[in-house]
Every structure is written in structure tokens, then in C-alpha cells.
Amino acid sequence: EKLSPEDRFSEVEDYIFTAGRSYRDFPTFVEAMRRVDYPGLLLYEEAVLLKRSATDVDLSNLPANVTAKKNEGEQSWVDYIRRAKIVVVPLLPSTMYAPGLSLYLMAMAMKKCVIVTEGLATRGMLKDEAVIVAPKDPEALAAAVARVWNDDALRHRTAESGRRYAERCGGESRLLSDILRVCAEICVP
């Protein structure tokens, strides 16, 4: 909900970051990273949690430019996002809910450029606030990564739009307030 100034910004932005547990398309991220020379960091969860959340990741065959690290808690996400140049949220298209929201909103709040898969987590919500790519398309993801990595103006413009969007969304207190308001509207005849 609240990020300290130290958590928000870093002078060093030196990799492409991805993480998450629910309905992540890590194979597409890995294949996209094989097509670019930029460093990547994949923050992974316990295998049991990933499997339960329909996420598959093979850490045995990563390209040389991708490092995998095990998630050690929510603060590690903040630390890794802070040092990322780009945050990628690769999502599986076959889900009936919107995964990836917490990762992309946290990254946006930290003024990071986000690349995210088109789907329920983006449709009707995002336009200029993120770079949106087709699902299960490593070539399109690699092209977006290269474009964002090399185009400072695009990266900064998208990150600034994303930051404004994340701030408009509010936070946990706003979410709880909205839930209470909707429940009250439903209960009143």
C-alpha cells in the first residue's frame, strides 16, 4: 500500500524481471529471453505452489542470460523490482480470472515499465500504462523487450503512465472500501 522512497527508486536498473505464481507463462518468457541478449531474472516460488496455480517452469534449461532465484517473501519482490529496468508479466490465456495484477501494479507504483500479456488482467484496463503483447508469442515478447530496453523515451513514458494508473487504483484500503460499498448496494433493497 505504501512504498518508502528507498523502495520506489534505484539508480541501477540492470535486468528484466519476472515473477509470480498464478497462471504465469514462464516458458514463453524463457523462449523470448533466448532471442535477446539482455539479462533477465526469474523469481520463482515453491514447485508445489506453482503447480497448484497452473504455472510451469523448467529451471534446468534456462538461457545463459537468465538467472533464477527463489522467492524469499514479499519484500524480495520489492527489492528485485526496484533494480529492474523492465518488469514482464507473462500470463497464460486460459484463465477465467485476472492474474498478475499485484505484480504489475506494484511495478507501476515503483515507476517501472511493464510488459504484460493481453488478457483478462489487461482488457479494458490498460492501454498506454503498459506494453501489451499477444499470449504465448515469444517472438512478440522478445521484440517488445528489445524495443522497451533500447527506447528510453518509450520506457519512461510508459512507466510514468503506469505510475499514475497505480496511484489512481488506490491500494488495499481502497479495495476494501469498494468491496464494502458494493456489498451495501447489493444488500439494500
Where are these predicted regions, by residue range?
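Short beta-strand->alpha-helix junction loop in the catalytic core
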Residues: 1-4, 46-49, 180
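Conserved donor-binding loops in enzymes that form glycosidic bonds
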Residues: 18-22, 45, 70-71, 93, ...
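Nucleotide-sugar-dependent
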Residues: 75, 89-105, 116-124
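Nucleotide-activated donor-binding/catalytic signature segment of Leloir-type glycosyltransferases, i.e.
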Residues: 44, 52-86
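A short alpha->beta transition loop at the rim of the catalytic pocket in nucleotide-sugar-dependent
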Residues: 85, 107, 111-112
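Conserved acidic donor-binding segment of nucleotide-sugar-dependent glycosyltransferases
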Residues: 128-139, 147-152
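Conserved donor-binding/catalytic core segment of Leloir-type glycosyltransferases
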Residues: 6-24, 30-41
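A charged, aromatic-enriched C-terminal amphipathic alpha-helix characteristic of glycosyltransferases
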Residues: 153-184
